Amino acid sequence: MAIPTLNNYAMPSQWKANKVNWSLDPKRAALLIHDMQEYFTAFYGENSPLIAALTEQLAAVRKQCKALGIPVFYTAQPKDQSPEDRALLNDMWGSGLNKSPELQQVVAALRPEPDDT
């Protein structure tokens, strides 16, 4: 089974009030950009308004985090995964990036910078 084509949807324009009253402490925070690889975003189709909005917002969050000294980390699946390494992923999502290694890169606007991890 592979990931199906996914539908676009509107990003929220307003956020609900926070449930807690604490503030973010930049010295104890990190930003994780998870699986923003071309392989995954492609399931929303070319020129997806959702992916464009998401990428723009994530780029703004990353910029603010860097200004505050918050480290940025990325997850990204490798292009060559053995069936043993993929394990349950094969059962759920098929062969993944093994079929499309050219799509391994993180989307251009969010590619890791030299000081990212």
Where are these regions (language model features)?
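Active-site acidic carboxylates
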Residues: 1-115
